[in-house]
Amino acid sequence: MKKTLMLLAMVVALVILPFFINHGGEYGGSDGEAESQIQALAPQYKPWFQPLYEPASGEIESLLFTLQGSLGAAVIFYILGYCKGKQRRDDRA
């Protein structure tokens, strides 16, 4: 019980602490950071690929990103569960 409470307190601290450490900081994505580095290193660079679909807003882009991650996690955990169930079935036989 004590160990569980200690782990829970650590998880809560890890979630909340970054908001106080970097208060007022800007949370940018890696795409934006990569784009700024490319522009700094090679200003003449022209992208050779355009996205097939450009979301109408940032909210839709976030939704699609979240759905993609959720679908990927569902596939991974389905496969893990399937393999675990198959292993249990084989152990019983």
From Swiss-Prot:
Recorded topology in the membrane: Multi-pass membrane protein
Chief localisation class: membrane
Transmembrane segments: 5-25, 63-83
One annotated Gene Ontology cellular component of this protein: plasma membrane
Top-level taxon of the source organism: Bacteria
Compartmental location: Cell inner membrane
Molecular function GO terms recorded: cobalt ion transmembrane transporter activity
Annotated metabolic or biological route of this protein: Cofactor biosynthesis; adenosylcobalamin biosynthesis
GO biological process, alphabetically ordered: cobalamin biosynthetic process
Keywords: Cell inner membrane, Cell membrane, Cobalamin biosynthesis, Cobalt, Cobalt transport, Ion transport, Membrane, Transmembrane, Transmembrane helix, Transport
Annotated InterPro entries: CbiN
Family listed: Belongs to the CbiN family.
PANTHER family linked: COBALT TRANSPORT PROTEIN CBIN
Protein role: Part of the energy-coupling factor (ECF) transporter complex CbiMNOQ involved in cobalt import.
HAMAP family associated with the record: CbiN (MF_00330)
Subunit (UniProt): Forms an energy-coupling factor (ECF) transporter complex composed of an ATP-binding protein (A component, CbiO), a transmembrane protein (T component, CbiQ) and 2 possible substrate-capture proteins (S components, CbiM and CbiN) of unknown stoichimetry.
Designated name of the protein: Cobalt transport protein CbiN
UniProt source species: Salmonella paratyphi A (strain AKU_12601)
Phylogenetic placement of the source organism: Bacteria, Pseudomonadati, Pseudomonadota, Gammaproteobacteria, Enterobacterales
